[in-house]
Amino acid sequence: MIVTSIGGTTMDVRPYRIDPATARQSIEAGEAVVLDLTSPLIGSAIRGRIPGARWVSPRDILDRNRHTADLVRALPDLPRDKTIIAYCTCPDEEASARLTRVLRRQGYDAWTLIGGLPAWRAAGYPMEANAA
């Protein structure tokens, strides 16, 4: 958790985070769509992705010159009636946290996977081969 203190109140500056166990339950119940923001090289090094995850270029998400509307249009069709779970392998979940903020501003129920793909894998949860 990254925290800051404002007026004596400590708060997580990265809200809307979901732990791997809760994410897995949502995915297995068919309640979530998963977005993979790993770089292809890092994803390959980890040897896989969360089953059914849709890949999104982290470069596009981290490009501060792109407008929010452009980012949302560049994404695969996302259902508004499902939870969106984004993950990456960035330090401090940078790409997935930014995408989560963008999607929430657009009215999606979006969450960042705490610890990203490494945490999912460390928990021993299912992985599938990366798309060729």
Where do the model's predicted regions map?
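Flexible, polar/low-complexity N-terminal or interdomain linker segments that lie immediately upstream
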Residues: M1-A45, N130-A132
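Conserved beta-strand scaffold positions in the cores of enzyme catalytic domains, especially
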Residues: V34, A53-W55, A110-T112
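Active-site regions of enzymes building and remodeling cell-envelope glycoconjugates
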Residues: R49-R59
